[in-house]
Design a protein with these regions (language model features):
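Alpha-helical structural signal in soluble globular domains
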Residues: 58, 62-66, 115-123, 155, ...
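Hydrophobic/aromatic beta-strand patches that form the interior of the parallel beta-sheet core
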Residues: 36, 85-87, 126-128
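Conserved SGNH/GDSL esterase-like catalytic core that processes O-acyl groups on lipids
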Residues: 1-72, 77-78, 83, 107-114, ...
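Extended, charge-rich low-complexity interaction segments
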Residues: 26-30, 116-120, 161-164
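Short, well-ordered beta-to-alpha junction loops that form the rim of enzyme active sites
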Residues: 39-40, 88-90, 131-132
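Histidine-centered active-site loop/cap adjacent to the catalytic His
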Residues: 126, 137-166
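Substrate-gating cap/lid alpha-helix
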Residues: 70-71, 92-130
Length: 166
């Protein structure tokens, strides 16, 4: 779903947070082999990259403690081996329209890889720096063009296969 934040509700869409959707999605989809998280860009509309990464940390800790928070006959991860892959948000380009709430947030978006690396080391989860793999569209500076989606999908596939086989 486009427009989702990590944990910060937007006044016009207070239901569009990752934290709000996560418990229902996890409980409905269990058991899982792995979980991929890629959130953060929309947080920059009103918050810093550090605040966004703190929100991602809340999501990861929710996943890591899900079975204790919401016990069920089927564990969240079928083999009780949590596999979480965090993808950094892509860089926000320089050609974002002045009217867009993400205008001028490129520098802040480039902080995600270093901040998320520290978080992932602390919480013992895998990370992939998408900013080394794909570029934002020249059209809006925020989204990816189809060829960039393909590059990212192939990179995630390879990383995920290695993670699940481990």
């Amino acid at each position: 779903q486009n427009g989702r934040t990590t944990v910060f509700p937007e006044p016009s869409k207070n239901f569009m947070t990752g934290l709000g959707a996560l418990p229902y999605a996890l409980d409905t989809l269990r058991p899982l082999d792995a979980i991929i998280i890629m959130l953060g860009t929309n947080d920059l509309k009103e918050h810093t990259a550090q605040a966004s990464v703190n929100g991602v940390g809340t999501l990861i800790r929710t996943i890591q403690t899900f079975d204790q928070l919401y016990p069920a006959s089927v564990p969240l991860f079928g083999d009780n081996k949590p596999r979480i892959l965090l993808l950094t948000p892509i860089e926000i380009g320089e050609n974002v329209a002045e009217w867009d709430t993400l205008y001028g947030k490129g520098e802040e978006s480039r902080k995600f890889p270093a901040l998320m690396k520290g978080l992932c080391e602390w919480l013992d989860v895998e990370m992939m720096n998408t900013q080394e793999i794909v570029q934002p569209s020249k059209v809006d500076g925020i989204h990816m063009m189809p060829e960039e989606h393909r590059k990212l999908a192939l990179a995630v596939r390879d990383r995920l296969l290695g993670l699940v086989k481990a």
